[in-house]
């Protein structure tokens, strides 16, 4: 017998970390964790709950065993029953003994039917328009001054790190679409946001590239809801979207509708919400609007289209 269950069954909202679920009451012969990086935070209720499952054999499957640091890998090893003391200082040996790595090319060598069409990558470098550059230089100068003032003050290290991360966030928002920076500052100060009346070279180029391939379906992976809203408002073709606010039911509906939609349709996806766990081989054009925190996250997102079942070349 095989039981397939979502992680949500083990993550009881509002419950205690040691809460008992139906999966904890069985002595399993084997437990396989797909997308195992979901348990990488050892302090989370989900991670603690998953590690309490009773099983004779434990497997983990993931394309991103390390997100932020080797602590992520240590947590995965904990689920496998490998003591932390053995992992530290013996990472290479642990990898050689316990890890089986298979790339898409490896699978094609095993079975020719698993060979995928090529995936072509293009890094599009753009110069900012003068008004964009002026805005970004202002944001950069503000960030410098804020960080200097923070480090001069007698504040905790955690607070300093928070300030740095916020400055980086504002700079990223400005580079993607300046209006997001203005909206973010206004929300923080509880004021009415100024309106960006300038142009966005990145957005204009995106719309031009999409328009150049009207017979192909497109995936656009974004970081922020603000940019998703803007992109969707500017496109005249059929659009679909998944972000963090979309329920599981609506997520399935959006995916099904995109698959049935005519050529030229666009699926706008927040990368942290839909960058994994989706099969979207209908799309052959993939755009990543901004670098992800972890480059492996981008590869996961691209894999929504370039995966088993894809019959045409994919352009990223």
Regions found by a protein language model. Name each.
Residues 4-5, 9, 24, 45-55, ...:
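Inter-lobe coupling linker of SF2 helicases/translocases
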Residues 6-9, 35, 61-65, 103, ...:
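A short beta-strand-to-loop transition that corresponds to the Sensor-1 phosphate-sensing loop
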Residues 22-60:
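SF2 helicase catalytic motif II
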Residues 23-25, 51-56, 67, 211-213, ...:
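Conserved catalytic network of the ASCE P-loop NTPase/AAA+ motor domain
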Residues 53-87, 108-143, 266-316:
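SF2 helicase/translocase ATPase core recognition
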Residues 112-132, 154-278:
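Conserved Helicase C-terminal RecA-like lobe
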């Amino acid at each position: 017998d095989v039981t397939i269950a979502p992680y949500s069954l083990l993550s009881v909202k509002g419950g205690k970390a040691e809460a008992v679920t139906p999966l904890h009451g069985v002595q399993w012969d084997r437990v396989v964790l797909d997308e195992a990086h979901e348990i990488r935070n050892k302090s989370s209720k989900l991670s603690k709950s998953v590690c309490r499952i009773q099983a004779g054999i434990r497997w983990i499957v993931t394309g991103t065993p390390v997100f932020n640091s080797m602590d992520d890998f240590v947590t995965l090893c904990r689920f496998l029953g490998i003591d932390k003391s053995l992992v530290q200082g013996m990472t290479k040996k642990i990898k050689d003994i316990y890890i089986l790595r298979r790339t898409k090319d490896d699978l094609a060598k095993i079975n020719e039917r698993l060979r995928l069409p090529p995936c072509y990558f293009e890094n599009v470098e753009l110069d900012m328009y003068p008004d964009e550059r002026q805005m970004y230089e202002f944001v950069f100068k503000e960030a410098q001054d804020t960080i200097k003032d923070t480090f001069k003050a007698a504040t905790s290290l955690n607070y300093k790190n928070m300030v740095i991360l916020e400055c980086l966030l504002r700079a990223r928002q400005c580079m993607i679409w300046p209006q997001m920076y203005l909206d973010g500052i206004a929300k923080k100060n509880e004021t009415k946001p100024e309106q960006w009346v300038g142009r966005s070279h990145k957005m204009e180029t995106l719309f031009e590239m999409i328009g150049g391939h009207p017979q192909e379906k497109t995936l656009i992976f974004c970081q922020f809801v603000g940019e998703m809203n803007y992109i969707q408002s500017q496109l005249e073709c059929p659009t679909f979207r998944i972000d963090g606010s979309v329920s599981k039911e609506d997520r399935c509906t959006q995916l099904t509708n995109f698959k049935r939609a005519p050529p030229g349709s666009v699926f706008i996806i927040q990368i942290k919400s839909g960058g994994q766990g989706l099969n979207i081989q209908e799309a052959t054009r993939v755009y990543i609007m901004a670098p992800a925190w972890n480059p492996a996250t981008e590869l996961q997102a691209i894999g929504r289209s370039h995966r088993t079942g894809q019959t045409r070349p994919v352009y990223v």
